């Protein structure tokens, strides 16, 4: 009997010790699993973006989002305005503080003096190919000059729109334009551009590919040329390479925060786009030639009307181009 009791007690003690060992083993295993999971979580956490409610937008002088134009009720306290003008302005206006004077005048129209910037350019053709536009609203003054041999409508097309361009090797390759937004832009001291359309067998249509004299001339001795040909047709191109460069460009869309004011020649009478007589619905104006002070006074006086048809730092593909003439 005593042997049975001792055996029972011993069995119970062994069971208790074994159970205690099993529980400790399970506890240690759970601790190992939990700590390892926490370690992995801490390591991976910096690489996890749990809340990503937006996308990265490329900014090239404008945000690729259309903004509702609310300038009519805006005090412009948070907006910036850049006025671009030719270097010839400082030849006529000798006052070293002329920009300060204009800043004070813009202040009377609701533009703080630290929000208006004046920037000069030497060559409108070079400026138009790669304009550096820094402000919420950008106004470019273009002076009319017959001697420049420039088509102002082509300048406006370049400045008022964003372009993606790549160089062309017309000596080795044929080129075709894919759609209406695809243009060939030539620029230089003297650009003469000739083209020869090709059929499916790369034979000239109305021209001979080996005889430049048979090519169709689309531009002669111009400083800036935007060539538009029939889409989807290969072309052999001839250009005065020693005085001109050519690029294959794609129009991305309008810069809605940019306006052009063309300062016309003294022999031109045109009030069709004058902001002083016609309410503006586009971003293109004209002011017939006056002294530069009078031009700037006109711009200041009508600045808030001008920006009504612009969009602050916006580039909407559905909006019309904008060009003013003074």
UniProtKB/Swiss-Prot annotation:
Annotated stretches, region: CNP motif: 165-167
Cellular compartments annotated: Virion; Host endoplasmic reticulum lumen
Modification after translation, per record: N-glycosylated.
Keywords: Calcium, Capsid protein, Disulfide bond, Glycoprotein, Host endoplasmic reticulum, Host-virus interaction, Metal-binding, Outer capsid protein, Signal, T=13 icosahedral capsid protein, Virion
Signal peptide region: 1-50
Record keyword Hydrolase present: no
Residues annotated as binding Ca(2+) 1: 95, 206, 214, 216
Disulphide bridges: 82-135, 165-249, 191-244, 196-207
Pfam families: VP7
Binding site for Ca(2+) 2: 177, 228-229, 231, 301
GO annotation, cellular component aspect: host cell endoplasmic reticulum lumen; T=13 icosahedral viral capsid; viral outer capsid
Location of region: GPR motif: 253-255
Gene3D superfamilies in UniProt: Glycoprotein VP7, domain 1, Rotavirus outer-layer protein VP7, domain 2
Residues carrying covalently attached carbohydrate according to the record: 69, 238
Broad class of the protein's primary localization: virion
GO molecular-function terms, A-Z: metal ion binding
Subunit structure: Homotrimer; disulfide-linked. 2 Ca(2+) ions bound at each subunit interface in the trimer hold the trimer together. Interacts with the intermediate capsid protein VP6. Interacts with the outer capsid protein VP5*.
Family that this chain belongs to: Belongs to the rotavirus VP7 family.
Function description: Calcium-binding protein that interacts with rotavirus cell receptors once the initial attachment by VP4 has been achieved. Rotavirus attachment and entry into the host cell probably involves multiple sequential contacts between the outer capsid proteins VP4 and VP7, and the cell receptors. Following entry into the host cell, low intracellular or intravesicular Ca(2+) concentration probably causes the calcium-stabilized VP7 trimers to dissociate from the virion. This step is probably necessary for the membrane-disrupting entry step and the release of VP4, which is locked onto the virion by VP7.
Note: Some rotavirus strains are neuraminidase-sensitive and require sialic acid to attach to the cell surface. Some rotavirus strains are integrin-dependent. Some rotavirus strains depend on ganglioside for their entry into the host cell. Hsp70 also seems to be involved in the entry of some strains.
Protein name: Outer capsid glycoprotein VP7
